[in-house]
Amino acid sequence: MAVTRRRFLQGSAAAGAVVAGRRLLFGDFDVFRGASGRGATPLPLIEDFVPTTCWIGKQDCGMIARRIDGRVVKFEGHPGNPRNLGTLCPKGQAQISAIYDPNRVKTPLIRTNAKGVTGEFRSATWDEALALVADRVNEVRARNPKLVLWQKGRSKAKVFYDDAFTKALGCSKLGHGAYCSDTGYRAMEYTIGMHGVQHPDFDHVNYLISWGWNITNAGGNKFCWLTWNQQLVKARARGLKVVHIDPRLRGAGPFTDLWLPIKPGTDLALALALCQQLIEKGYLDVPYLSTYTDGPHLVGEDGRFLRDADGLPQVFDRAANNAVSADAAADPALEGSFLLGGNLYLTAFEVFKRHLADYTPEWAAEVTGLRAADIARVAEEFGENAQIGSTTVIDGVELPYRPVGIMSYHMAQQELGFQAMRAMTMVAMLVGAVGAAGGLRSDFTWKVNKNYEAFGNLEVKDPPYDFTLAKSKYYPINTGHPGIVAKVMADPAKYGVEEIPEVAILHHVNPLGGFTDQQAMMAGYERFRFVAVIGPWISETADYYADVVLPAATIEKYEGPLSASDGIVEATALRVPPMEPLFESRGEIDIYLDLVERIGVLYGEGGYLDQVNISLGMKESEFALPLDAKPTVREIFDQWANFKKIPGGVAFFEGNGVFVKGKIPPSKIYGYAADPPFGGARHRLYGESLLLAQEAMKTKGAEQIYWQDYTPLPTWRDPTYEGSPPDYDLYLISYKLVEHKQSRTTNIPLLVELAPRSRLDINPATATARGIGEGDEVWVESHNAITGETRRVKTWAALTEGMRPDTV
């Protein structure tokens, strides 16, 4: 669908309105003045429309930019983009303010005062600023490239930033996901091999557990907001039943059949009880559990798998009446105990079943604050709705049909999150819903992530460690946590680290304003010898620690490639600049092209252009970028689009915005339809490698707080916050607002007007007991049971019945 069109606006009313708007946004430019200066003569104004994508939100919704004389005056949703189908959230509409924000960084800046205090900067040319950054980077690269750190907040063109840039430099990199959803990602990679958290198959699901999903006001796994809500509404229209598990009702009320107001941080206990009930009531998909999980693997009294001479796990084959390798078994036993060679072995499923024996609904009710009857009811309904043994045909492919699903995402970020997510996944595994039609999904396509294999062979090394503490006795499963890195930077010897980064390149990230424990962040960032910041504004981090600030464009740039898939159809989008970059800002890819050229790693084998070719999959094709000539960003995307056989190359996106390939085939969506099924991964009920890692951590002297949750089966323990003094008698949770995205929206006036400040949601009974009324200012103080520290913040009270009385 072509959406670009041009026309002339004639007539004084239309022209006058546009002139007024133009003056408001852009000032009183000479183009509006009469040649003699004796009165304004409205000129014909050119209106056109440019397809692009949202710059602020997570999921890159399609947008149509309305322009007057080349300047954007309005954004609307792109009706042809599968992700948002013509709709936009408040962020999409309001980001026009970000483009014209007078507080944007207008030129490159160089600090003129000491760091650690409010910054003073002078304007610089791009040549001077880039030369300074390149010199500092090369000074350190000459000794050790890993001592250059590239850190991102939100990366919108992973190929060019996360991959090509860091590989060309050989530098370290650090993301923000440890504050977002990485716990869920790591748990799913470990358990079923998928790089995602949890979402349902909305086209076919009949029963959904909405587990901490902020229905109607936030995103979920993979998507930001609009896509899931539209799919939810369609599913509800055909009868989808929803169970909402959350201490706060949120906006889920009209879309929920049962609300379980769980005590914060006790999701693991509930998931264990659901597993216990499913097994007790016989809701088991035995063929799936026997064939595609490690449930039949034999476990010795030491907790380790029985293995043959080649190291392969053994199962008890009832056909052979003996132990054989898992892949060779004709009839593997899922349950039972077996005496082999004088030693007793239980199947992993048998170990799991016995492990769950005491995790009853009555036990979970005491822990979670829910009713035992409701817990048993959800387990019963989940098992019934799974329709174990049934099949359906989708696009000509017969698949197991298990129309029960789970949606979860940010709730994974809790103290027991890794094991909670594993247990929640096991709820779906028991009924065979993982990768089935209507069942549990985790990514858009069924592709086993490299971490699945790596996590099955966890390394726990002796120091010295690198500054992320990867493969250390502290964090064998490591996602690169900025908060931990900051603590290591401040005191590397404490963690057995000998070298810390000296130069940081911060890409759209604001650790001081966006991450927790500001004091620790400041202590860490003080250790960098040089900091370069790429972004449109002076953030708190740039203010205190940037040596150089490079002004990035907002939406006015080429960026991508971007997925436009809704999980049902396959589509690709590209961010197309709806106007030229304002001031002296540049698109990030332009910045990196210039920077790597200055550093000396743009050309040749292994250089930036070579890495771009590799990351885009073009290296061996006729469309590969030449390694001896500097392209424009548009030329790069034109080569890529032609490589992808998109008609017209990049011009297609400039005219259409999105390329819709078609419906995703079942072989990509469903694990059962993949070749081989589930990508060859054997799903882990029993985590032997977690046990081995725990033993190694203990041997190397790690404290209990580090190793206590490396258990082969999800195991409940009281969260550490229960050790706070009794005066701290409420639980504190956070939630997302659709009006804001991280800290990049806090300076957009339209969004600040819609959601001007945080509030404290509190149950009326709790508020009354404390003498708190609607709108009262209150202090909220929290206590760290590990360090004994307290932090407090002032906010205002909002009374709501949709909140547990012991939770705010």
Where on the chain are the PLM-derived regions?
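Phosphate/diphosphate-binding loops
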Residues: 528-530, 537, 576-596
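Long, contiguous, secondary-structure-rich segments that constitute the structural scaffold
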Residues: 14, 18, 578, 588-643, ...
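N-terminal export/assembly segments and adjacent metallocofactor-ligating motifs
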Residues: 1-287, 291-333, 344, 362, ...
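Flexible glycine/proline-rich, aromatic-decorated loop/lid segments
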Residues: 251, 540-574
